[in-house]
């Protein structure tokens, strides 16, 4: 009788452990953060109430071919990108821009994915030529699209002298010029 009770308890405990593994294996422990919060973590000078929405290469292709919007192409580990975003954000805020599509290009560019090559083809007249003679999507790049047509393209700091640093490049004159240029681009279409 004692042995039977012990076996029953073992069986119940075993069933409970199996149930725990199944339950905990399906449970999503990740906390949900918004794109704006994620962007703010990657670009620490930007607050969490920002218009940046993460998109993949499929979405970028769809915007470039059919839609209206602003696409920011880059990656957060780039110091030039960090400064570019820091200077871009106030202009977006002033103009009440509610959505900027952010395409983190690093993985697709490294792997030269099919979609990335299609994006390069669509942007070919805006791309710079490398020393090897190939077109290359340098970042940061800001693309203004209206009804599937690129109307403006800005990659002001994508090719800067190797001895120049972002904090020395962005002086008062450069900031004013950049803000004026982006304000002009934003006035040419309704991006909201």
Predicted regions span which residues?
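Short, internal strand/loop/helix patches
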Residues: 117-135, 145
């Amino acid at each position: 009788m004692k042995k039977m009770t012990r076996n029953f308890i073992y069986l119940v405990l075993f069933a409970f452990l199996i149930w725990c593994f199944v339950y905990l294996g399906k449970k999503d422990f990740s906390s949900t953060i918004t794109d704006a919060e994620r962007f703010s973590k990657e670009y620490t000078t930007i607050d969490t109430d920002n218009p940046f929405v993460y998109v993949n290469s499929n979405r970028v292709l769809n915007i470039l071919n059919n839609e209206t919007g602003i696409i920011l192409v880059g990656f957060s580990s780039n110091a030039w990108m960090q400064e570019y975003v820091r200077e871009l954000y106030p202009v977006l805020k002033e103009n009440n821009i509610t959505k900027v599509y952010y395409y983190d290009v690093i993985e697709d560019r490294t792997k030269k994915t099919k979609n990335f090559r299609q994006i390069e083809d669509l942007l070919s007249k805006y791309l710079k030529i490398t020393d090897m003679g190939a077109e290359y999507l340098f970042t940061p790049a800001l693309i203004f699209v209206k009804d599937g047509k690129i109307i403006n393209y800005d990659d002001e700091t994508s090719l800067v002298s190797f001895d120049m640093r972002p904090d020395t490049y962005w002086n008062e004159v450069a900031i004013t010029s950049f803000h004026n240029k982006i304000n002009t681009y934003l006035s040419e279409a309704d991006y909201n």
